[in-house]
């Protein structure tokens, strides 16, 4: 629908020729793009080679994506000179290229960064909540962090329900119907109750 928790919408895959039309939807769904294949190649090669890539491998993968949009090419010598970490840059590249495509959760779980990424408040754009004529927040249910960003869901430390338990949340529970079919299957740690 035409809803957004933040007020921002994703432009990816929208056909401008169909704007304002109630017909003409797409019959094809993008499941995987060549860009994702190149990113998978870069990450897998990096991991298999002991956290290293050659400039040739970066040119074959990351720089093909960057060349497509006339972006500055990734260069190992520059990364080193600027004190930048290759692993962080590869992950950032993936986060940007695949934004809005539904891969972020799986990436964070694979990288074991759940505590870092999911253990904090969800915030929106910096709106600097406007005060009404009486000097009060007209939206009392809306929390605002120290930067003026609207808080949609608070972390446990702030009294909300959001938290990430590393002993439990890296695995999903085994569904009860599957466990009933095979009582020897057991349950993943933390999901026993």
Language-model features: locations:
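Acidic/polar-rich alpha-helix caps and helix-coil junctions
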Residues: 1-193
